[in-house]
Design a protein with these regions (language model features):
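A solvent-exposed interaction/effector surface
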Residues: 2-184
Length: 184
């Protein structure tokens, strides 16, 4: 009986250690640091989305693949601009803009050609609250949601900032980070 109990404790300990390791790998213990930065001018190619934010990955992949395959434009940063707080808005009514950040435009392609399939705009120049979080795959996005948004809400409240307004998430693949931006 003692051997079985000891084995159960070892198995439970191993599972907890494994879960803690996975959580740490995807940024679960990363320090959340807030910076006020000037940013803007990024060219955003996107689709408007209404409904559950879980659609974002599928939409982002679609925009990426069409830009790559139809226009020969390779992008390295995806993004989502999320307008509604899921705690206050019904999932079916949540609004977002999801797509890719276009860093260069091939000479043979015009903005009007891309606008036949997607919306295009520039990120407004301005002051943003910025948080960087490690990006090591889609699990990092989920861990980021659990870690960054509660910390962001506390920061906004502590500093008397406006809690309304969109949050932008930039998925910077080459630099392996998610950048959260909120206009201030």
């Amino acid at each position: 009986m003692k051997k079985i109990l000891k084995m159960i404790v070892i198995i439970i300990g191993a599972i907890i250690a494994l879960l803690a390791g996975v959580y740490a790998y995807y940024g679960g213990f990363s320090k959340i640091t807030f910076n006020e930065i000037e940013r803007g001018g990024d060219v955003l190619v996107y689709e408007n989305v209404v409904g559950d934010y879980k659609q974002a990955a599928t939409v982002s992949d679609r925009v990426y693949n069409i830009l790559l395959n139809d226009y020969n434009i390779e992008t390295f940063k995806g993004f989502g601009i999320y307008y509604d707080n899921p705690a206050n808005v019904e999932k079916s009514k949540m609004r977002s803009e999801v797509g890719c950040i276009m860093e260069t435009m091939p000479g043979s392609i015009t903005v009007s050609q891309i606008e036949t399939q997607f919306n295009i705009k520039e990120l407004p120049q301005g002051k943003y609250l910025s948080i960087e979080f490690p990006f090591k795959g889609s699990m990092s996005i989920l861990v980021g949601i659990m870690r960054v948004y509660p910390a962001l809400n506390k920061y906004i409240e502590r500093n008397g900032l406006d809690s309304e307004g969109a949050i932008m998430e930039i998925y910077d693949v080459p630099n392996k980070k998610i950048i959260y931006l909120k206009a201030i």
